[in-house]
Amino acid sequence: MIDDMAVPLTFTDAAANKVKSLISEEENTDLKLRVYITGGGCSGFQYGFTFDEKVNDGDLTIEKSGVQLVIDPMSLQYLIGGTVDYTEGLEGSRFTVNNPNATSTCGCGSSFSI
């Protein structure tokens, strides 16, 4: 785990609070939010979010408000400088990534290219 001064990715209060709420609903305090990147989508790469109980060797862990965000090293290289947030709007509620490394994104924002 690293301190706030050296964090290469921002984990917003809104995202941390939603993770805390979901973990409480699941009644499993070992859960962490994992963000990852896979190939696919209309722009080449897409973001994924899942809950995970374990942290693998090399994973970056960011803690906020008592919950953890976990990123694998391969995904982290594409996410440096980005922000993981949680938004609620007309199109629904979801975790989002604001990624300054993306040169283009699809209309829904779920995939991107570099």
From Swiss-Prot:
One of the Pfam families matching this protein, by short name: Fe-S_biosyn
Protein function: Required for insertion of 4Fe-4S clusters for at least IspG.
Oligomer status and interactors: Homodimer.
The protein's required cofactors: iron-sulfur cluster
Record note on cofactor: Binds 1 iron-sulfur cluster per subunit.
Source organism phylogeny: Bacteria, Pseudomonadati, Pseudomonadota, Gammaproteobacteria, Pasteurellales
Gene label: erpA
Keywords linked to the UniProt accession: Iron, Iron-sulfur, Metal-binding
Residues the entry annotates as binding iron-sulfur cluster: 42, 106, 108
Protein name: Iron-sulfur cluster insertion protein ErpA
InterPro entries hit by this protein: FeS_biogenesis, FeS_cluster_insertion, FeS_cluster_insertion_CS, FeS_cluster_insertion_RrpA, HesB-like_dom_sf
Annotated GO MF terms: 2 iron, 2 sulfur cluster binding; 4 iron, 4 sulfur cluster binding; iron ion binding
GO biological process terms on file: iron-sulfur cluster assembly
A cellular-component GO term for this protein: cytosol
Family: Belongs to the HesB/IscA family.
